[in-house]
Amino acid sequence: MTVEFCKYLSQKTGHEYRLPTEAEWEYACRAGTTTPFHFGETMTSDLANYDGRYLYGSEPKGIYREKTNSVGTFQVANAFGLFDMHGNVWEWCLDHWHENYDNAPNNGDEWLDSSENQTRIMRGGSLLNDPSMCRSSSRFHQKASETFKHVGFRIVFSL
């Protein structure tokens, strides 16, 4: 559905829109940082929407909101001005799922299989996850044909 939406939007506007590659997503999330989260070493439920009943590091337990929030609810943008890169909803990436990065493109291009692999990468974690699943480096996968209330997407505009 997400790839089809990007194709539709591209045809409608005459500009190329697509899902980000996994490498692009992580670059956008980190925004030049090297910490687990773009806002630092740890996370609290004051900074993102995740299952706050789980601890991360030395932080106390937080709130479990049980629903998605509107974009920008926490008003914690990264250095690129992007909101909600951690938690709220998993975000689809263009790449197919691979267990590791062996033989992955080293230039940021998408990594697609020639097989029937329809399992795609998701990044960012969601409201249902503990904080460790919301780190900049965390990754998950699902069949692209499946839909969930805790999965969304953000699109890339190609220049």
Predicted feature locations:
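Short, structured beta-strand segments at or near domain termini in extracellular proteins/domains
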Residues: 149-159
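Functional-site microenvironments in short loops/helix caps that host divalent-cation chemistry
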Residues: 1-138, 147
